[in-house]
C-alpha cells in the first residue's frame, strides 16, 4: 500500500517529511528538543523560508536514532488552494523513495485526499513492456489525529486514475474494441455497475450506420459498451455519459502522417475517461443513476474502407457526407449520442472525446474545451473541475457555425472549413442530442501529456477529466 494514515511516531521510516507554510515553520512534536534546536539552526543558516516548492533536507539524531528529515515548502497559507497544494506537494515528494512519515505543520492544512492523490500520482508508471521495471516506490504514512474516513476519496480516485491511464497507455495491438469491452465488463464486476455489450449485428439493427462505417475496414470488429449504475432506485433522473472509443485511428483513407499516428492509442481517451467516471461513482456509492455508452472501434484502411464522398445515414435518420475519413470520432459519437438519448432515455449527457487538433491550437495541451447547449450545466461542470488539478474553458457555440457543415449532397458534412474546427465538430455533435441538456468535452490536449506540464510530467496518459465528471455528478442535486 503506497498510502496509509497513522496516529503515532515510529523510528522505522526511511525519511520524515514535513510540509510547511512560509508564515512560520512549526517543527513536529515527534522531534526531541535537541533535534528541534539543530533543525532550527539549519533552517536559519540556509535561509529556508518554506517558499512554494522549496525543499531542505537534514540528518538528525532524534531520540538516539539517526533520521533523514525533509521540509517541503507550500508558500503562503492564504494563497493555497486545491490546485497549487497538489503542485507543491508533488514538487516536494516526486524524487523521494522509500517509507516516509509525513505531516503538515499546520492542522488547517490537513488534507488527506490531496496528499493521497499526489502519492499515487507520483508512483504511477506504465512499465509493462520494460524488461526492467521500477522497483522502488514512495510509501507514505500520514501522521494525523484526524478521524480517517473508510473510503478516502482522493486515494480511491487516484487508484482509478491509474486504471484510466493504463487503458490509454496500452498499445492498440492489445487494447482492441473487444479487449476494451472485456475490461469494462471486469471493471463493472469489480466496482459494482452493470455492463451490456452490443455486437456488430445488434448495432446494425439499431441503425448505427455512421459508427459502423468507421469500423468497416478494421480487422478487429466494433462493440458498443453500455454501462449502467443504479444508485438511487427512487430517482427517475439518469445522468448520461458518452466516451469516444477509437482504440486506434489511422485516419482511414484520409491517412494520417506517421508522427500523428504514434499517439493514436490515446484516441479512446474519452472512453477511458467515462469508464473511470463510472468506476468512481460506483466505488464511492453515490446515490445517483448513471448510464455510459462507448461505441468502440478502429479506423483502419482496407478494400472496404469508407471513403471521402460517401453518404451515411446515422441512427437518428440524418444523412452525412463524408468529407474527411479522419474526422471519424464525431461519426461514432453521433450514433452513441443518439443511442443514449433515445434508447437509454437519459436526462442529460456529458461526452468526452479526443476530438480535434483545433482545440489544442486554441487552448494548448493543458486545457479542456467545453461546449454546451445549456449554460448552467456547463458552469457546474467547470466549477467541478476546480476541485482537481484540471483546467476547463468554455468555447463558443453560435448558430452561425452551422453554415460550415452544409453539404450539397446530404443533410450535413462531417467536416467544415479549417477555421473554428473544434466548434464545427461540436455543432456537428449537437445535431444528435435532440433537446437533451448536453456538455461536450474536447480532451484532445488533456488526455495525453507530452511531458511539459509540471504536474503531468510523465509522457503519456494523464488520467484527467474523469474526476471532474465524478464531482459534477456527486454535487448535482438531481
Swiss-Prot record:
GO terms for biological process: proteolysis. It comes from the Bacteria. Its EC number is 3.4.11.1, 3.4.11.10. Mn(2+) 1 binds at residues 249, 326, 328. Its main location: cytoplasm. It is found in: Cytoplasm. One of its GO terms (cellular component) is cytoplasm. It catalyses: Release of an N-terminal amino acid, Xaa-|-Yaa-, in which Xaa is preferably Leu, but may be other amino acids including Pro although not Arg or Lys, and Yaa may be Pro. Amino acid amides and methyl esters are also readily hydrolyzed, but rates on arylamides are exceedingly low; Release of an N-terminal amino acid, preferentially leucine, but not glutamic or aspartic acids. GO terms for molecular function: manganese ion binding; metalloaminopeptidase activity; peptidase activity. Mn(2+) 2 binds at residues 244, 249, 267, 328. Binds 2 manganese ions per subunit. InterPro entries: Leucine_aapep/pepB, Macro_dom-like, Peptidase_M17_C, Peptidase_M17_leu_NH2_pept, Peptidase_M17_N. SUPFAM superfamilies: Macro domain-like, Zn-dependent exopeptidases. Keywords: Aminopeptidase, Cytoplasm, Hydrolase, Manganese, Metal-binding, Protease. Transmembrane segments: none annotated. It is an enzyme of class 3 (hydrolase). Its cofactor is Mn(2+). It holds the Pfam family Peptidase_M17_N. The active site is at residues 256, 330. Presumably involved in the processing and regular turnover of intracellular proteins. Catalyzes the removal of unsubstituted N-terminal amino acids from various peptides. Belongs to the peptidase M17 family. This is Probable cytosol aminopeptidase.
Amino acid at each position: 500500500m503506497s498510502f496509509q494514515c497513522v496516529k503515532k511516531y515510529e523510528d522505522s521510516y526511511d525519511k520524515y517529511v514535513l510540509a510547511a507554510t512560509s508564515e512560520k515553520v512549526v517543527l513536529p512534536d515527534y522531534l526531541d528538543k535537541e533535534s528541534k534546536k539543530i533543525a532550527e539552526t539549519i533552517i536559519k543558516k540556509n535561509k529556508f523560508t518554506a517558499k512554494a516548492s522549496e525543499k531542505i533536507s537534514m540528518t538528525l539524531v532524534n531520540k538516539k536514532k539517526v533520521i533523514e528529515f525533509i521540509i517541503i515548502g507550500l508558500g503562503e497559507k492564504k494563497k493555497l488552494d486545491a490546485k497549487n497544494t497538489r503542485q507543491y506537494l508533488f514538487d516536494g515528494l516526486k524524487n523521494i523513495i522509500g517509507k516516509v512519515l509525513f505531516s503538515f505543520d499546520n492542522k488547517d492544512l490537513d488534507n488527506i485526499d490531496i496528499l493521497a492523490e499526489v502519492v499515487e500520482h507520483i508512483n504511477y508508471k506504465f512499465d509493462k513492456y520494460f524488461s526492467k521495471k521500477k522497483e522502488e516506490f514512495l510509501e507514505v504514512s500520514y501522521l494525523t489525529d484526524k478521524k480517517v474516513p473508510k473510503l478516502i476519496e482522493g486515494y480511491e480516485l487516484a487508484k482509478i486514475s491509474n486504471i484510466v491511464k493504463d487503458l490509454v497507455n496500452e498499445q492498440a495491438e492489445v487494447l482492441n474494441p473487444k479487449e476494451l469491452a472485456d475490461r469494462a465488463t471486469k471493471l463493472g464486476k469489480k466496482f459494482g455497475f452493470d455492463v451490456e455489450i452490443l455486437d456488430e449485428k445488434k448495432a446494425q439493427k439499431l441503425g448505427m450506420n455512421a459508427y459502423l462505417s468507421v469500423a468497416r475496414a478494421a480487422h478487429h470488429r466494433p462493440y458498443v459498451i453500455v454501462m449502467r449504475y443504479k444508485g438511487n432506485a427512487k430517482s427517475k433522473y439518469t445522468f448520461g455519459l458518452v466516451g469516444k472509443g477509437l482504440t486506434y485511428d489511422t485516419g482511414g483513407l484520409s491517412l494520417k502522417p506517421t508522427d500523428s499516428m504514434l499517439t493514436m492509442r490515446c484516441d479512446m481517451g474519452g472512453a477511458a475517461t467515462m469508464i473511470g467516471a463510472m468506476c468512481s461513482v460506483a466505488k464511492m456509492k453515490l446515490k445517483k443513476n448513471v448510464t455510459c455508452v462507448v461505441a468502440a472501434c478502429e479506423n483502419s484502411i482496407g478494400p472496404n474502407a469508407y471513403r471521402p464522398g460517401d453518404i451515411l445515414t446515422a441512427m437518428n435518420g440524418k444523412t452525412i457526407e463524408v468529407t474527411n475519413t479522419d474526422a471519424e470520432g464525431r461519426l461514432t459519437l453521433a450514433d452513441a449520442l443518439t443511442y443514449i438519448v433515445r434508447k437509454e432515455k437519459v436526462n442529460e449527457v456529458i461526452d468526452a472525446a479526443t476530438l480535434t487538433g483545433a482545440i489544442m491550437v486554441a487552448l494548448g495541451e493543458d486545457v479542456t474545451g467545453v461546449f454546451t447547449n445549456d449554460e448552467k450545466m456547463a458552469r457546474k461542470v467547470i466549477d467541478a473541475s476546480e476541485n482537481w488539478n484540471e483546467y476547463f474553458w468554455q468555447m463558443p457555440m453560435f448558430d452561425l457555425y452551422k453554415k460550415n457543415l452544409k453539404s450539397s449532397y446530404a443533410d450535413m458534412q462531417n467536416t467544415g472549413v479549417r477555421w473554428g474546427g473544434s466548434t464545427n465538430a461540436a455543432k456537428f455533435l449537437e445535431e444528435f442530442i435532440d433537446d437533451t441538456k448536453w456538455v461536450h468535452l474536447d480532451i484532445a490536449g488533456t488526455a495525453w501529456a507530452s511531458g511539459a506540464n509540471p504536474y503531468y510530467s510523465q509522457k503519456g496518459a494523464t488520467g484527467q477529466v474523469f474526476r471532474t465528471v465524478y464531482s459534477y455528478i456527486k454535487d448535482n442535486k438531481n
